[in-house]
Amino acid sequence: MFLGTYTPKLDDKGRLTLPAKFRDALAGGLMVTKSQDHSLAVYPRDEFEKLARRASQASRSNPEARAFLRSLAAATDEQHPDAQGRITLSADHRRYANLSKDCVVIGSVDYLEIWDAQAWQEYQQAHEENFSAATDETLRDII
């Protein structure tokens, strides 16, 4: 399970060091793809394969699902962390997420999100009030 907030730096070669506590779960390979709100999603390879299979099954008859699958496949990059736990983010991914040197990696239960530190701070400020409302309304049946 991926939980917590971490603040790694992006180096000049576009490499990001993954949090040490997640490296074992990602050692078998991982998939980096574009996500909502101009962030990146990092899935363990097996989790991504499940997601892609579900999208592929739905895509045969649904134009929106086919478009989603195309976008997902085109925007995804397979990575294997190096000995120091670093992955190289493509120039396209860095541009999409507006990544500067200061990044934030957050756990999102079954995957990680990579954000530019400033964008993450702005996102949190903009959605702080929504947290209480979501807890009351959206999560009523879960919690």
Swiss-Prot record:
Segments forming a coiled coil: none
Subcellular location: Cytoplasm, Nucleoid
A cellular component annotation (GO) from this entry: cytoplasm
GO biological process, one term: negative regulation of DNA-templated transcription initiation
One Pfam family recorded for the sequence: MraZ
Domain SpoVT-AbrB: 5-47, 76-119
Ribonucleoprotein found in the keyword field: no
Key words, A-Z: Cytoplasm, DNA-binding, Repeat, Transcription, Transcription regulation
UniProt keyword annotation of 4Fe-4S present: no
PROSITE patterns: SPOVT_ABRB
MF (Gene Ontology): DNA-binding transcription factor activity; transcription cis-regulatory region binding
NCBIfam families: division/cell wall cluster transcriptional repressor MraZ
Family: Belongs to the MraZ family.
Quaternary structure and interacting proteins, as annotated: Forms oligomers.
Name of the protein this chain belongs to: Transcriptional regulator MraZ
Organism for this UniProt entry: Mycolicibacterium smegmatis (strain ATCC 700084 / mc(2)155)
